[in-house]
Amino acid sequence: MPQNTRHTSIVEMLSTPPQLPNSTDLNSLSEQTDKNTEANKSDTESLHKSISKSSSSSSLSTLDNTEYSNNNGNSLSTLNSQNLLSVHRQEWQHTPLSNLVEQNKLIFIRGSISVEEAFNTLVKHQLTSLPVENFPGDMNCLTFDYNDLNAYLLLVLNRIKVSNDKITSDCQNGKSVPVGEIVKLTPKNPFYKLPETENLSTVIGILGSGVHRVAITNVEMTQIKGILSQRRLIKYLWENARSFPNLKPLLDSSLEELNIGVLNAARDKPTFKQSRVISIQGDEHLIMALHKMYVERISSIAVVDPQGNLIGNISVTDVKHVTRTSQYPLLHNTCRHFVSVILNLRGLETGKDSFPIFHVYPTSSLARTFAKLVATKSHRLWIVQPNDNQPTASSEKSSSPSPSTPPVTTLPSLASSYHSNTQSSRMANSPVLKSSDTSNNKINVNINLSGPSPSQPQSPSATMPPPQSPSNCPASPTPAHFEKEYRTGKLIGVVSLTDILSVLARKQTHHKEIDPQMARKQRGHIG
């Protein structure tokens, strides 16, 4: 029997920022830069030169979608972006916002279109948010994102109350609801706008306060040219980190040294510089996780076992997997079950069983945290304390972690729950949730609506109901494999994009007192 081999994941190998070209290329680049500077001194600050893809085999590359893979071969897709492949002569704070504009990803939608159309546009273009215009050229847009879709779903199911009775009635009676009305239901920060001539020194103070995205305009501030999100900025800084020597001391520091995240379970309350750890038990229903994310105004939630060990992650973007009536039983199944379903769906999309690593340790370096945030495309990572029988994470700052093999336990019974006729009717009537042929969202999850037959009880270790056909629903990850990858240690903290950006902001003299929770307070925390 051939021995199974485990390929080291790219996230494990990536402890340092992407390489810059070799010294010969840098010298050549510097000489050319000096010539250009003499020719046009007024452009010195923003001067940069794109690196040719063929200049060196060690050229800077962009990590667009890196996943932990358990099959023979790393799940890695590399996308080189012209805007990111550049070397800057100045410190990162002086980088103009024009360097980060991606006009091809700027897509507006009208406030009059339905939530269904808005959702399909998100999926079609693989975006996480869309500016909603009340009229062409609107400069004061609200944005539609998956938090709004989650609110819509909860409203359809009568899980939340809003002041607009007409919207409530239309949602629950299956009528089309304008997306412009739905985006008003979720508290949002002001629509910040900055001209493309501003630099990162300015925007870091805004994004570091918890604002998720900023509009980049032309110099006259009469036209929006792009949207700069927290995630995009983190990605840019990571992929150009070697061009910014002043980042190195921070990247080499551990989360514990930087005091990022809630690192002591005994603390009653986090400090103003820290995010609260919000989690849900794995045996609680998925609908409770979605409701908790809505109430807490968060975009992802940790899934833990009764002992507080991290076993998974649910993001608000995962709500796209429960937008059809055939997927309704997932809402009343467990969060643990849903995590296994998500992994299975990723396998359908990529052809590989994937296990994204959403955790770090207190001893993890900021560089490693950057790498994992970029690789998982997440807004936060969970900080865990390794189990006693796991290898210590003390080497994370300087070397790749060793794969751990904690004890394997079986999952509890995950029989599908029965659902009420009233809620089932609401799901069926919803314009978004009733569609089973949406061209841009064809995700099939075969669920036994009536639950297991009494004469044929489910296996205690099952993670998904038996598929109707092997061709349309491949087997989900086995319980052993699932537990092996996710039983990472006790959840003790969380580090978010906001936490990291606020640290960068506070390193500047004029942002010393920045509060990473400011924007969240403006949005209005509930509960």
UniProtKB/Swiss-Prot annotation:
Subcellular localization(s) per the UniProt record: Cytoplasm; Nucleus
GO biological process: cellular response to glucose starvation; regulation of mitotic metaphase/anaphase transition; septum digestion after cytokinesis
Low complexity bias spans: 52-61, 391-417, 450-462
Region of interest called Disordered, as start-end residue ranges on this chain: 1-75, 385-481
Molecular-function annotations in GO: protein serine/threonine phosphatase inhibitor activity
Polar residues compositional bias, start-end: 21-31, 418-449
List of residues that carry Phosphoserine: 9, 42, 46, 430
InterPro entries on file: AMPK_gamma/SDS23_families (IPR050511), CBS_dom (IPR000644), CBS_dom_sf (IPR046342), Ssd23 (IPR016711)
Note: Present with 21200 molecules/cell in log phase SD medium.
Function text: Involved in DNA replication and cell separation during budding.
Name listed for the protein in its UniProt record: Protein SDS23
Species, as recorded: Saccharomyces cerevisiae (strain ATCC 204508 / S288c) (Baker's yeast)
Lineage: Eukaryota, Fungi, Dikarya, Ascomycota, Saccharomycotina
Gene: SDS23
